[in-house]
């Protein structure tokens, strides 16, 4: 006698099992290795189960489990809440066999791997031979082993739709729906509302105006900010005057944090746009490779930007934070981390400008432009940095977005003396230190608008504005077309690269360095400066800088 697995999931005794050799049967009896063990090693594996048998079991004991899929997925029996009812257990990581009886049958006779026909059809589909070959089956089980699945804390979500009969020729997007969902975040407008006594999140797509909003109820898993933090925030005063930019940086987010948790946490302070940073779009092949590695299309950066509708919401968010070492922190939870402190970095409007304490005048001809400034850098921090290298600074202005008043990563600095201005232009670079940021940025002359030629003062160009500015430390002047040719086109062709003088023009908010002159069709090669006057240009700039009060200039009157 031998124990066999009955269709109902029970064990029964039967006649001696006959081993098969092709289509011929032998009368040799096969001894069972189970000896009463409920987990018997039999010659019947999952590869031999027909789809009709699984379908009948689904109809009897798993009704409704596959209603959303249209067809029955055999793995749903393996991922059921109580798989012992079916005589099959969880998948074993260390073997190709996928039932628990082989895993625990230490004293039983485990059938060798070669006894199983790797190309034997197990499902009634056209591509069954290719779908269930052992190599692909092993690859699939290895993928399960590398996922978040474990025997002690079993989660059936990663197992669903993973080993279905037709799943071996689909993309990884369909094999790993949970990975894709957690890795790709979309920008959403979130507002928390109270409907029928319950709190809901109204989620809308800012790019789909006609799309109806989506509502998500705030249950136990999505509590957002604790009530104590909200109560403490309400007790603190709110200024009637704007104090912060409506755009806030959030750093240190857990990698596995969900969109819903971020919505619930920061939506508690008011209507907000969640702006997730993204990678550039990749092609399909690159995206498939990233999904194979377990990553999604969103860069794993750990930060997000918040754009609140009202500035008051930012003040409430700051009041709810803990202040530690000049930084604001707020607690946020994820599936793997509870109450993690994430950094909240608001931008104060008072940090946009810096003015020197003395009453020295601000000369715009001594202004430089600095790009690539770290966003947390305040105007006073940049002023101290430049004063330590080149000389006293009278004004610093951080370039901001006109609507949100958030830094754009650039600044304008005006020096108190012409000597400090020339030293900064000659130095070209400065190391900006702010907190943990340390960045080397370039210093360029700030090209202004509506400036007359410094050589002819408009007499030779009919008083038109000068289109060119020379940023070389020996020039630092505005030139009309005629004066540029007269002062820069020399006869010496052996000039070094650092001695070359290129024209700079201002177009809108951008300053460009031209490699050829627009008014000369054949182009030009920069040459050393050729001045007919005995006084050097630098000397004239230094003398002029102490008394000139000219206004900014930038965009030339010509279109190039």
Curated annotation (Swiss-Prot):
Short name of any one Pfam family annotated for the protein: RRM_7
Molecular function, one GO term: mRNA 3'-UTR binding
Ranges for domain RRM: 246-349, 366-437
Entry's transmembrane regions: none
Gene Ontology biological-process entries: cell differentiation; meiotic cell cycle; negative regulation of cytoplasmic translation; regulation of translation; spermatogenesis
Keywords, alphabetical: Developmental protein, Differentiation, Repeat, RNA-binding, Spermatogenesis
The keyword RNA-binding is annotated on this UniProt entry: yes
A GO cellular-component term linked to this record: nucleus
Region: Disordered, residue numbers: 1-43
The keyword RNA-binding appears for this protein: yes
Role this protein plays: Cytoplasmic polyadenylation element binding protein that binds to and regulates the translation of specific mRNAs. Essential for progression through meiosis. Involved in spermatogenesis.
Complexes and interactors: Interacts with fbf-1.
Protein name as annotated: Cytoplasmic polyadenylation element-binding protein 1
Chain's gene name: cpb-1
